[in-house]
Amino acid sequence: MSAPRRELAGGTRGAVYVEFLIAFLPLFSFFLCLVQLAMLQTANLIVKHAAVVAARAAVVILPDDPDRYGGANINRAEGARREKIVQAATIPLSTLEDIPFPEVRFPTDEGGDDDRVVFGRDDLVRVQVNQLYRCRVPLARTIVCGAFFGLKRLRGEASLPNQGAGYGYE
């Protein structure tokens, strides 16, 4: 082996660069995961807020005057009344997606998957809002949100008593 080659084989030039690359990639990945996790938790709070907004809208809309909803029956979550409640849930979710498509249900029990339609006076109106959230941070979306296209299903639930009017509309 010639003298210049022996010098290159025993040299330490570039060691700092290699050490930097070894330390940088895990730290940068960790930073990206923290950013994605912060965005995911912010979206989770927005979905929970959308559930509260939908519950507040439901206790106002369900016992409201039938003439405002095309003659739909009072205290029934269907037709125009349901559309207005879904619209109320969609407004806060528009900060997450350009055109959000929330799934709004009225479960009978907390965390339930049924969809109640008829409510009586003083019944508890429970609203559940489900929204698919698209994780967008490169590399971190597969780690934080899973490998399924970077989508995470977020769920918010809120309930309020139905304190509808004790009189009839004429």
What is each stretch, according to the model?
Residues S2-A3, A57-E170:
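Short, conserved structural patches
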